[in-house]
Amino acid sequence: MDVFMKGLSMAKEGVVAAAEKTKQGVTEAAEKTKEGVLYVGSKTSGVVQGVASVAEKTKEQASHLGGAVFSGAGNIAAATGLVKKEEFPTDLKPEEVAQEAAEEPLIEPLMEPEGESYEDSPQEEYQEYEPEA
């Protein structure tokens, strides 16, 4: 049972990390969009204020999206049976959890399951085929 709970805990951490990575990617995209829009706005007279406003709204929406992805990940984990809905924390902020996960060292290295090897298997030699004329 302890192994099962550890597996669920690792799955929860994975869901949280995935949600944070998604949020981080969207936030970075919003920042780049903001930079691009501000550059274009600086070349066009009279629209800089409106452009900055649009860029800031884009950044805010990226933050909201990250939170939605986090709660959606919890719903997916519950629907697949990985965790019970009531076990999934609802009061966590994705950015806080991801920061904690990044600061904690990995207790034990990830290992391959016994008997399984992920190395490339040797490829068979093939004879070249030459069609008859």
Swiss-Prot record:
Positions annotated as Sequence repeat: 20-30, 31-41, 42-55, 56-66
Entry-annotated residues carrying Phosphoserine: S45, S117
Expressed in which tissues: Highly expressed in the brain.
Keyword Phosphoprotein attached: yes
Keywords: Cytoplasm, Phosphoprotein, Repeat
Keyword Protein transport: no
Phenotype caused by lack of the gene: Simultaneous knockout of SNCA, SNCB and SNCG exhibit an age-dependent decrease in SNARE-complex assembly. Thus, synucleins are required for maintaining normal SNARE-complex assembly during aging in mice.
Pfam families: Synuclein
GO annotation, cellular component aspect: inclusion body; mitochondrion; presynapse; synapse
Region (4 X 11 AA tandem repeats of [EGS]-K-T-K-[EQ]-[GQ]-V-X(4)) residue spans: 20-66
Family annotation (SUPFAM superfamilies): Synuclein (SSF118375)
Top-rank taxon, per record: Eukaryota
PTM notes: Phosphorylated. Phosphorylation by G-protein coupled receptor kinases (GRK) is more efficient than phosphorylation by CK1, CK2 and CaM-kinase II.
Cellular compartments annotated: Cytoplasm
GO biological process: chemical synaptic transmission; dopamine metabolic process; negative regulation of neuron apoptotic process; neuron apoptotic process; synapse organization; synaptic vesicle endocytosis
Primary subcellular site in the record, as a coarse category: cytoplasm
Residue ranges, compositional bias (Acidic residues): 97-133
InterPro entries: Synuclein, Synuclein_beta
An MF annotation (GO) of this entry: cuprous ion binding
Region (Disordered): 96-133
PANTHER family per record: BETA-SYNUCLEIN, SYNUCLEIN
Family: Belongs to the synuclein family.
Known function: May be involved in neuronal plasticity.
Protein name listed in UniProt: Beta-synuclein
Organism, scientific name: Mus musculus
